[in-house]
From Swiss-Prot:
Gene: caf17
Organism: Aspergillus fumigatus (strain ATCC MYA-4609 / CBS 101355 / FGSC A1100 / Af293)
Comp. bias intervals (Polar residues): 25-37
Gene3D superfamilies: Probable tRNA modification gtpase trme, domain 1
Keywords for the protein's UniProt record, in alphabetical order: Mitochondrion, Transit peptide
Record-linked InterPro entries: TrmE/GcvT_dom1, YgfZ/GcvT, YgfZ/GcvT_CS
Superkingdom, natural source: Eukaryota
Pfam family, one: Beta-barrel_CAF17_C
Name the record gives this protein: Iron-sulfur cluster assembly factor IBA57 homolog, mitochondrial
Similarity annotation: Belongs to the GcvT family. CAF17/IBA57 subfamily.
Record-level GO cellular component terms: mitochondrial matrix
Region called Disordered, residue ranges: 25-44
């Protein structure tokens, strides 16, 4: 078995610096494989064959991306980041503020023939491999007269990696903070990358030229530790940390960035100027309450799992995996609105979009919570309709939503800030009412 634990709580102050899903759901059967992914090692790296790359080069490439993504591309205005050549986590939204694609964006490494001759800004956009053509179409639609070139990289041109060292992560990486030291990705390096800020201590994201092993480019044990693992093992580690990735889990044109925890993951800059989809995102951040979020879930058949805040992966567990998009409901409960939606999983763990005040003990507002520790939840699904290509068998499994410590701290800090904001607003209204009553009393005296 493999579980992730956190001995330290994330500082809420540090983290603070940094329409719901459609009811029409296409059930997608989980991919079947005879090989069960192994538990992730404490140190290792994985070749991410499910990710694709798009190059954007040209004098207007930076401002072009600035108007399309949730992250701030104009790092030259920030003295702490101006000298750094690191990538960043971000998202492309549609005009309604829903996610088109989650992505990483990296400065083009030196030695690239497309940029070395011109010296113009150039970027690599990493995205779900199945979504490269869709994102490229979206970019071309917004290109207009911008002076830039767009190109999807061929397989083998560059390779995307995830690398981690659970026992030796720098404190600034473990807490989703940027190091004050110089970037490990030097301007002269052929390797692009960044600290993966989607969960504390999750590791680094790297892009290397060609198809060679990561150690060919980074032979130093201090940079890359452990052995290479397969994509399935990386997926297990990602889900244990509660990280959704790609449009199989972050549903295109349906998911909202804050429900996908992109605010906690430092994928949204709430101080930047206009970009596509900004209005709903900013309004929700400043005035709304995010009642649903993606969290890791534990799947089980009979006995409830032990209490904890992170799931435990058991490769030998005999648990049926529900189809993606399946509704979560209360066990022995009346039919009503769904408590959440299952997004995907591996073995006995997965990810789900959950209503926090129903499936967890998180309290978001002063209205109180509907959560009960004794209440169990289930996912039930029927056989696909006749003629469907899906081979999913009908079944049912119980599910428990878990909130990792870093996400709990972030949500709690937001709830406290909201409560203080409401108290301040009520205080201002009370003062205004008092002044109004005093003025009316003064007028009556003068009559």
């Amino acid at each position: 078995m493999r579980s992730i634990t956190s001995s330290k709580r994330v500082c809420a102050h540090c983290l603070s610096r940094s329409r719901l899903f459609s009811t029409t759901v296409q059930h997608r059967a989980q991919p079947s494989s005879n090989a069960v992914p192994s538990s992730p090692p404490r140190s290792g790296y994985a070749r991410l064959t499910n990710r694709g790359l798009i190059s954007i080069t040209g004098v207007d490439s930076t401002t072009f991306l600035q108007g399309l993504i949730t992250q701030n591309m104009l790092i030259a205005n920030d003295p702490r980041r101006a000298t750094r050549r690191t990538g960043t986590y971000t998202a492309f939204l549609n005009s309604q503020g829903r996610v088109l694609n989650d992505a990483f964006i990296y400065p083009m490494p030196k030695g690239d023939s497309e940029t070395d001759t011109t010296g113009d800004p150039a970027w690599l956009v990493e995205v779900d491999k199945n979504e490269v053509s869709s994102l490229l179409k979206h970019l071309k639609k917004h290109k207009l007269r911008s002076k830039l070139k767009l190109r999807a990289l061929e397989d083998g041109e560059r390779t995307v990696w995830s690398s981690w060292k659970d026992h030796a992560e720098p404190r600034w990486a473990a807490y989703n903070l940027e190091s004050e030291s110089s970037s490990p990705f030097a301007p002269s390096s052929s390797v692009a990358g960044c600290i993966d800020t989607r969960a504390p201590g999750f590791g680094s994201r790297l892009v290397t030229p060609g198809e060679e092993d990561l150690r060919v480019h980074l032979p130093d044990e201090a940079q890359v530790a452990g052995s290479q693992v397969d994509l399935g093992t990386y997926t297990v580690r990602r889900m244990l940390h509660g990280i959704a990735e790609g449009q199989a889990e972050i549903i295109r044109e349906s998911a909202l960035p804050l429900e996908c925890n992109m605010d906690m993951m430092r994928g949204v800059d709430f101080r930047k100027g206009c970009y596509v989809g900004q209005e709903l995102t900013i309004r929700t951040h400043h005035t709304g309450v995010v009642r649903k979020r993606i969290v890791p879930v534990q799947l089980y058949a009979n006995s409830a799992p032990q209490s904890g805040d992170t799931p435990v992966y058991d490769p030998s567990a005999a648990v049926a995996l529900p189809p993606s998009g399946s509704n979560i409901s209360k066990v022995d409960g009346r039919k009503g609105r769904s408590a959440g939606k299952f997004l995907g999983g591996v073995g006995n763990i997965g990810l789900a979009l959950c209503r926090l005040e129903i499936m967890t003990d998180i309290v978001l507002t002063g209205e109180g919570s509907h959560y009960s520790p004794e209440q169990e939840f289930k996912i039930s699904w029927s056989a696909p309709e006749e003629g469907s290509s899906s081979a999913t068998e009908p079944g049912e499994v119980k599910v428990k939503a878990l909130v990792p410590p870093w996400l709990r701290d972030y949500i709690s800090s937001g709830a406290r800030n909201l409560a203080r904001k409401v108290d301040n607003q009520e205080g201002h209204r009370a003062k205004e009412l008092l002044y109004q009553l005093e003025e009316e009393e003064e007028q009556r005296r003068n009559e």
